[in-house]
Amino acid sequence: MIVLHARDCDPKACTALRAHRMGLVELTRHPGDVPTGAVVLDPTVEKALSREDRDAALERGLVAVDCSWEHVHRYFGPLRRRCRHRILPYLIAANPVNYGKPCKLSTVEALAAALYILGFRREAEEFISRFKWGPAFLELNRERLEAYRRAETSAEVVRVQEEFLPDGL
């Protein structure tokens, strides 16, 4: 797993930096370091992550981008043509900063969710358990994650997601 890191955050609170210090992810500041064909978690696209992305993630890598919304295009733009951009479906954050907020996942939560959806449940559990609040993320989202994991395609993930969306969202 790779994190493209913009250094926009408080280093003491940054889950991506903590994961890197623990040896759980590679860290880079340059979009050119991201392998061609990698699966990039991208909140600005419409195609949902699904098990059909599993082989690409295994062969080319799974990438999260840790940057402020002000710099989204600076980091996602250079990757647009050469990587698979996928959005995560509806999930609830359990990190201390955004606990209970929908779609406000930390970088570590996003990577754990992606692993789970791609079918790497045990690896997702091991990865997120390294963070004090990690098991809470899995428990809060267990039903959703299991349903997304069972979906074969992006279209199926989107259909399943509809069942979990609150009214008005």
UniProtKB/Swiss-Prot annotation:
Key word Ligase present: no
What function does this protein fulfil?
A: Aminocarboxypropyltransferase that catalyzes the aminocarboxypropyl transfer on pseudouridine corresponding to position 914 in M.jannaschii 16S rRNA. It constitutes the last step in biosynthesis of the hypermodified N1-methyl-N3-(3-amino-3-carboxypropyl) pseudouridine (m1acp3-Psi).
Q: Which GO terms describe its molecular function?
A: 18S rRNA aminocarboxypropyltransferase activity; S-adenosyl-L-methionine binding
List GO terms (cellular component aspect). cytoplasm
**Record's keyword terms, sorted:** Cytoplasm, Ribosome biogenesis, rRNA processing, S-adenosyl-L-methionine, Transferase
Chief location of this protein within or outside the cell: cytoplasm
- Reactions the enzyme catalyzes: an N(1)-methylpseudouridine in rRNA + S-adenosyl-L-methionine = N(1)-methyl-N(3)-[(3S)-3-amino-3-carboxypropyl]pseudouridine in rRNA + S-methyl-5'-thioadenosine + H(+)
Q: What is its EC number?
A: 2.5.1.157
Q: Which family does it belong to?
A: Belongs to the TDD superfamily. TSR3 family.
Q: What is this protein called?
A: 16S rRNA aminocarboxypropyltransferase
Q: Where is this protein localized, as stated in its record?
A: Cytoplasm
The family database entries (PANTHER family) matched by this protein are listed as: 18S RRNA AMINOCARBOXYPROPYLTRANSFERASE, RIBOSOME BIOGENESIS PROTEIN TSR3 HOMOLOG
Extract the Pfam families matched here: Ribo_biogen_C
Concerning InterPro entries, the annotation shows: Tsr3-like, Tsr3_C
List ligand-binding residues for S-adenosyl-L-methionine: T15, V65, L88, T107
**GO annotation, biological process:** enzyme-directed rRNA pseudouridine synthesis
| Keyword rRNA processing in record | yes
